[in-house]
Curated annotation (Swiss-Prot):
Residues bound to a divalent metal cation: 6-7, 102
EC number: 3.1.26.4
Cofactor: Mn(2+); Mg(2+)
Enzyme class: hydrolase
Membrane spanning residue stretches: none
Record's protein name: Ribonuclease HII
């Protein structure tokens, strides 16, 4: 079984990094491609949401994983991203024979065969499917967390460092789910961040 993995939320200031792992047969690959499956960044939110049930129904296997803000702060974004990918892979019902990893960096924590593919989310349907599942899952979490932390507007920017988010950080300070290691680079100590 070949599995594609991808992550979302790597550059956010808030919340976990998400990853998904997806295995597709050749027929499922063709069907999803015909439905417009491509890199999640090239799709509208509605189109991504519409594709999710098709991906879940047609995939041989799929799973999600997360790397928490605490893990990002403790170990760095690369390790936390690898942990999210590893967790997704470990949730699959069958051990993959080959893992296709989006990007240039190999998954150091994975003991099996793997291949990195630059812009893999626009070249391999399994990676594109993983990018869509991870993006929709993370965006859903951000909308739920927006109800808990309404002053930050997470439903609008998903935790990325927009002007709205940076202003909310200055006004309200960070939450326990903010990535402190990212904030120290963005806000020098004398910048008024609580």
């Amino acid at each position: 079984m070949t599995v594609g993995v991808d992550e979302v939320g790597r550059g956010c200031l808030f919340g976990p990094v998400f990853a998904a792992a997806v295995s597709l047969t050749g027929a499922a690959d063709a069907e999803l491609t015909a439905l417009g499956l491509t890199d999640s960044k090239a799709l509208s939110a509605k189109r991504r949401a519409d594709l999710v049930p098709h991906i879940q129904a047609k995939a041989s296997a799929w799973a999600l994983g997360q790397g928490s803000a605490r893990e990002i702060d403790a170990h760095g974004i690369r390790v936390a991203t690898e942990l999210a990918m590893l967790r997704a892979l470990q949730k699959l019902p069958i051990q993959p024979e080959l893992v296709l990893v989006d990007g240039v960096l190999p998954l150091r924590l994975w003991p099996g065969a793997q291949r990195t593919i630059v812009r893999g989310d626009s070249q391999e349907a399994s990676i594109a499917a993983a990018s869509v599942l991870a993006k929709v899952a993370r965006d859903g979490l951000m909308c739920r967390l927006a109800e808990r932390f309404p002053e930050y507007g997470f439903e609008r920017h998903a935790g990325y460092g927009t002007a709205l988010h940076r202003q909310a950080l200055i006004t309200s300070g960070p939450t326990a789910l903010h990535r402190k290691s990212f904030l120290t680079r963005l806000f020098p100590r004398d910048d008024g961040l609580r």
